[in-house]
């Protein structure tokens, strides 16, 4: 894949169940209040370490607030060598309304 794909929450959930990595690019405070269970917070400070440690061929779902910023982040990750990247349409807001039980609270790890 040379480009990322935009996907709805249902497809993102299916990818999660298959072991996809989910990264959340919202601000740290918002992430701490509520995020997709098992997701990792990703920002300008952590992205280099994330890329260095990541499996570039593993499915990667990028989440933001409403599905806009995640597209730019997904395109960047593709440019860094990731081969299977997805942007969550509707972002965390649509995710939360679709899968309210699949959310968690707490600070980024």
Swiss-Prot record:
GO molecular function: thiosulfate-cyanide sulfurtransferase activity
First-listed, main subcellular location of the protein, grouped into a coarse class: cytoplasm
Active site (UniProt): 64
Cited SMART domains: RHOD (SM00450)
Rhodanese domain sequence ranges: 16-104
Protein location: Cytoplasm
InterPro entries listed in its UniProt record: GlpE_sulfurtransferase, Rhodanese-like_dom, Rhodanese-like_dom_sf, Thiosulf_sulfurTrfase
EC number of this enzyme: 2.8.1.1
Sequence similarity: Belongs to the GlpE family.
Protein purpose: Transferase that catalyzes the transfer of sulfur from thiosulfate to thiophilic acceptors such as cyanide or dithiols. May function in a CysM-independent thiosulfate assimilation pathway by catalyzing the conversion of thiosulfate to sulfite, which can then be used for L-cysteine biosynthesis.
Name of the protein in question: Thiosulfate sulfurtransferase GlpE
